[in-house]
Amino acid sequence: MFGILNRGHKIKGTVVLMTKNVFDFNEFVSTTRGGIVGAAGGLFGAATDIVGGIVDGATAIFSRNIAIQLISATKTDGLGNGKVGKQTFLEKHLPSLPNLGDRQDAFNVYFEWDENFGIPEAFYIKNFMQSEFFLVSLTLEDIPNHGTIHFVCNSWVYNAKSYKRDRIFFANKTYLPNETPASLVKYRKEELENLRGDGTGERKEYDRIYDYAVYNDLGNPDKNKNLARTTLGGSSDFPYPRRGRTGRKSTRKDPKCEIPTSDTYIPRDENFGHLKSGDFLTYAIKSLTQNVLPTFQKAFGFNNEFDTFEDVRGLFEGGLYLPTDVISKISPIPVLKEILRTDGEQVLKFPPPHVIRVTKSAWMTDEEFGREMLAGVNPCLIQRLQEFPPKSKLDVTVYGDQTSTMTKEHLEINLGGLTVEEALHGNRLFILDHHDAFIPYLERINDLPTAKCYATRTILFLKDDNTLKPLAIELSLPNPGGKGANSRVILPADGGAESTIWLLAKAYVVVNDSCYHQLMSHWLNTHAVMEPFVIATNRHLSVLHPIYKLLLPHYRDTMNINALARQSLINAGGVIERSFLPGEFAVEMSSAVYKSWVFTDQALPADLIKRGMAVEDPSSPYGLRLVVEDYPYAVDGLEIWDTIQTWVKDYVSLYYPTNDAVKKDTELQAWWKEAVEKGHGDLKDKPWWPKLNTPQDLIHTCSIIIWIASALHAAVNFGQYPYGGFILNRPTITRRLLPEPGTKEYGELTSNYQKAYLRTITGKVEAIVDLSVIEILSRHASDEVYLGQRDNPNWTNNIKALQAFKRFGQKLKEIEEKIMGRNKDSSLRNRNGPVKMPYTVLLPTCEDEGLTFRGIPNSISI
């Protein structure tokens, strides 16, 4: 008889779960709150409590402690809700089930069934143990007249007393709200209510509640008044995307600010439950920033200078001697031991960054300086110059006239006979403009004890070989007498003091760019803007909703890494403030940039057109033509953007054939309304927000979200160490202004240009801090899930959706081959540049872990 097992009228199921990991981040923090020293014993001593004696026999522990009840989608009880079956418990442990993942355990479970129960498409689960577990999946086999049903769960399940309602999971079927079987409507609605909460109280570890809050937890005024920071979000002066609400208590000194903590709440399922302990990268960041980096200050603080470029290269060749107390804080931590490469010796040694692996000094060339604006770690800021001289968008009544002081004569010296007008008309002049972002803060930045810098504008010329040649750099300071700026224009030079001044001018540009990249291009434009979409999706789109299934992989670990950033990276006194020029003003500067953020401009074609890097052209691929044909980020990115949009169109079309289908989807409309009005509430009245009235609106909106989470983040994140690991190439701080003629420092420009450069840029301690962190941020985990991949093949039961997804993956493989082919084309000089470093960061996949400089993860997970 089909579907009926020998055990009688019973359905066989297989439950896959993971026990609580000994390296679970929150648990580790709580067990090692006193510091890392001596943590080896404490950590492994805690393992017994965490695992809960699982080694004594999984079957004995789980057999009467985890109960499941099936819920019918086709048969109802007296109230019209799906029938709930009898409670049944896990049975036999299956230690060798095929395809069982790392640290996963499988168990049999048997359910009584008869035809009056119908088809189960949901289930309740209760955990009667004190320790939580991570439920991966439930698979029901041979349902009579139906076959196999998959439940993809991926959720932490705590003791049943932790929840007001029983935990419920749904099968991998997809229903629009108005198509939901009547028997499941109540369950679908209640689960969303569970996830929204009531907006009150302090969140507990086991909570799964998603809600919004402003960025009021970066400072710590109770500890030190100098650690007070402006609240970002909730005002027109300091607008910001929202973060996840924690409900923590306020500080004593400022009731509007939350008390910072090392145990920041995020909804439990947003916490890492899948990483192997050996490459728990965010755990490494936490340990590094709180325990190891302070010892670097002690170890190297007495001599915070590199004396030669060779000293800097020594970080990757011979290494730096480390005192014993520093080693003792690294050795118990496998990730740090690997990253900092002490190898049991008292030497700190970093891996060679890609930018110096082939040539040691090509980073200094003007061609590489220009190339990295097209194929570096921040390739989405350069613009085509469309008016000369460049003008400012700053308020004239506040800042005065900030128009550039560059003249035609400054440029035409190196234009090869062209006039500025001819070069402008021929689309051959480009600008990297950091003036407006820095001028409002520069006076305060330069008052900091270790920071001295300029606001910069750089104009470049597009040569016949498609490379960019820098023509002039403008260095500006606020006018000490009032409004306007004091500016100086620096031109390229080949010898003497002038050549060192040119090298220093490029350093001021790169420091502007490094800071803008880290705070705006990277943190704000990917991490921060994505979190509201994560929150709104979980609050308003059921797991049964097609758009939930589409977007879910692109949210993986984002809230977790963002919470970690607030704790250790962008917080008051954190890594960014200590190792980047703006110091305490860093995150506040990103708020000023958010004022002009436009959601629809995040689509790559719109971004390129807005920056003048492309023009609309119906006869060209993707409907636009690049002004710089050899623009690696744009060329590779457009292929990926188009493929993402095609996949989203194929998928959305399966569920939304008409405009009405979009308009009448109550969950969808509530999702987008809240994402805009609450998640990005400070910009909610902007006219550019799309309305979800048509399938095309939905396709474009989802494509932008996926693009930001995947390719855009990959482009601005995974090149950080390959380019910036060599601090000479991408310094993060300048500590002094250009020297005045007649001074000792001016004499060094000719007598010892390396010393002049090194005394100007990032010092030794700050460089080590920066390198230590960006190496972690640039790494891929061993279980990374890349664009075109899913962590579970049963994420949907829709065959057409699975087929469309397969086409998506195949297309990405084709793009990968094209990118590798372009990198081998010697006529495309910007693909490798003088440093001979192929542009691989947008290769979609990667088979290796670590510092690969390739691979597009689905989500912002690091």
From Swiss-Prot:
- Residue limits of the PLAT domain? 44-171
* Compositionally biased residues, Basic residues: 242-251
Q: Which InterPro entries match?
A: LipOase, LipOase_C, LipOase_C_sf, LipOase_CS, LipOase_Fe_BS, LipOase_plant, Lipoxy_PLAT/LH2, Lipoxygenase_dom_3
Quote the pathway field. Answer: Lipid metabolism; oxylipin biosynthesis
Per its UniProt record, the required cofactor names are: Fe cation
Domain Lipoxygenase as annotated: residue spans = 174-862
The alphabetized UniProt keywords are: Cytoplasm, Dioxygenase, Fatty acid biosynthesis, Fatty acid metabolism, Iron, Lipid biosynthesis, Lipid metabolism, Metal-binding, Oxidoreductase, Oxylipin biosynthesis
Q: Which PROSITE patterns does the UniProt record give?
A: LIPOXYGENASE_1, LIPOXYGENASE_2, LIPOXYGENASE_3, PLAT
From the UniProt entry, list the residue stretches annotated as the region Disordered: 225-257
What SMART domains does the database record attribute to this sequence? LH2
Q: Where does Fe cation bind?
A: H522, H527, H713, N717, I862
Instruction: Kindly list the GO CC terms recorded for this protein.
Output: cytoplasm
MF terms (GO), sorted A to Z? linoleate 13S-lipoxygenase activity; linoleate 9S-lipoxygenase activity; metal ion binding
Reactions it catalyzes: (9Z,12Z)-octadecadienoate + O2 = (13S)-hydroperoxy-(9Z,11E)-octadecadienoate; (9Z,12Z,15Z)-octadecatrienoate + O2 = (13S)-hydroperoxy-(9Z,11E,15Z)-octadecatrienoate; (9Z,12Z)-octadecadienoate + O2 = (9S)-hydroperoxy-(10E,12Z)-octadecadienoate
The compartments listed are: Cytoplasm
Which biological process terms from the Gene Ontology are attached to this UniProt entry?
fatty acid biosynthetic process; lipid oxidation; oxylipin biosynthetic process
- Please provide an example of a Pfam family that matches this protein in its UniProt record: Lipoxygenase
Give the EC number(s) listed in the UniProt record: 1.13.11.58, 1.13.11.12
> What is the cofactor note?
Binds 1 Fe cation per subunit. Iron is tightly bound.
Q: Which family does it belong to?
A: Belongs to the lipoxygenase family.
On subunit structure and binding partners, the annotation says: Monomer.
Alphabetical list of PANTHER family matching this protein? LIPOXYGENASE
This chain's function reads: Plant lipoxygenase may be involved in a number of diverse aspects of plant physiology including growth and development, pest resistance, and senescence or responses to wounding. It catalyzes the hydroperoxidation of lipids containing a cis,cis-1,4-pentadiene structure.
Q: What is this protein called?
A: Linoleate 9S-lipoxygenase 1
